[in-house]
Amino acid sequence: MRYCGIAWTELGYELAVVDDRGLPVEPPVHVAAGRVPQLTAHLLGLRDRSRAAGQELATVVDSTNGMLDGGLMSAGLHLYRADPWSLPERPAFGSVAALTLAVTAARDPATVVRLQIESGTLTGRVDQLEAAIAESEDATEALRQAGRCLAHGSREHRVVALTFDDGPNPPYTGRILDVLDRYQVPATFFCVGLHALAHHEELSRMAAAGHQIANHTWSHPYLPDLSRTELADQLARTDDAVAQVVGAEGPRLFRPPYGSRTPEVLSWLADGGSTVALWDVEPFDWALPGADAITRSILEQTRPGSVILMHDGGGDRSQTAEALPGVIEGLLARGYSFARMDQLPTD
């Protein structure tokens, strides 16, 4: 077995490959944030070279790197997650180094978890996520009553919000923007800072069309694994990246990756001035159920005031783009109109 660690940095990704003794077998590689297709192609080449040598390739990320799993697994790669309790302390900004991830997996394969497309980066930790969300109900409700948390708008108005997470991500973000333009429908995009500067054309297009641009962290981490300082840095750097492109103050609306939260995390977000954006309609489009299934799920779940969660990033989003016209036409036929999250009626 060969092990390829993938780390994220301020500028992109780094890759390091070792054998089952933890010894390097390939030169380290650095890939810019905007070149995820090239990163995927490089990994497929590594896999093929490994197989030619009679070995499989295990690709390893940590729990602060949530942007790659869908695309890499869809491409046929075997992806694993190393958790904080198996790793050394992270640097001030970035994940654990790629070589460390690879060596950790090589020396003790039992410490890493094989990821599944159905549960993504949180494979094996979904129960933990759900327990933390349940524990946060009182804190979430307190923020909602203070106007600092929104999962849906008023149930008295047939107005809904389309939202898209994890972009920008060419070509899928562009395809989704094309559909929104065709129907003249506003939306809210929760962008990941690591890719925002790399794909500034899509970000500029969102702003020019009047869509809302909001914060979805820098690297899509599982928030309970972050320190207060790490969380603040993730948000601040993403705000700055968006502001650099669209020429405005960075967003204050924030959606936690996976909806992950604890009472402590929510208090940190409140102290930092963020308004937490959740949702009440989820078609699980990231699991690639098919365009028809995505459309049907959204139409069945939507109520007045609904916030609909979809994805333009994090992998192949052709199904989401294909489903979107049917979603919009179906909701229009049911008497709904559309608003950005910051313009959704709340009373």
Indicate residue ranges for each PLM-predicted region.
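Glycine-enriched alpha-helix->loop->beta-strand junction motifs that scaffold or abut catalytic
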Residues: 77, 183-185, 208-213, 268-279
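Structural motif
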Residues: 61-64, 166, 312
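Catalytic domains of cell-wall/extracellular-matrix polysaccharide-remodeling enzymes
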Residues: 197-198, 219-337, 342-347
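Active-site beta->alpha N-cap acidic-glycine motif
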Residues: 135-230, 234, 241, 250
